[in-house]
Amino acid sequence: EIGSGLVGSEMCIRDSLELFISLAKSAKQEGVMAIEKRANEIEDPFTRSTLAMVADGFSADFIYEVAESDIKQMEERHRAGALIFSQCGMYAPTLGVLGAVIGLIAALGNLSDIDKLGHSIAAAFVATLLGIFTGYVCWHPFANKLKRISAEEVEIKKMILEGALALQGNASSIAIEAKLQAFIPVSERKSMRD
């Protein structure tokens, strides 16, 4: 559904563009009630509430303030979630080194037993390797992916807000398409017209 998922944001952008072009045409022919009717059919809460404000006749300033506040709150939640994984990535190598120190202390306690000495040194190296591996191969990439997904979702919501404000200002479908094309990479704009 439009703007409902984090995966496949291009499809959400395409759907959003098509939605607002369609809404502008419907509003021109049927009036504001067409926007309200379509808003009730949309599953995405942000899109639905923003369009409901347009249909209810709220001012552009009010719609902008409410939607922008919603976007900022979402960004903060996403930032806090990504921060947890970033911190895990920072601490994992340190914990690996701590495991190495503990393994070496155990090795020093077993200097007389060669078999135990080898196992303790191996455990020390494994702890270091796991700490570095999880930090740089798991936690940091996951945090970066969350940040990228969040940025894409913010762009989609900003596009939806711009489309809603254009509808509120009675912009034509051509004007809305031109305005919302700014959210689409230039290389993909031609394919959007096909």
How should each PLM-predicted stretch be described?
Residues E1-G8, C12-I13:
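Single conserved hydrophobic/aromatic residue that forms the stacking wall/gate
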Residues D70-I149:
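Helix-termination/interfacial motifs at the ends of transmembrane alpha-helices
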Residues K116-R189:
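Channel- or pocket-lining gating/hinge segments that regulate access to a cavity or pore
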Residues S16-S26, S49, M53, G103, ...:
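Solvent-exposed, amphipathic alpha-helical segments
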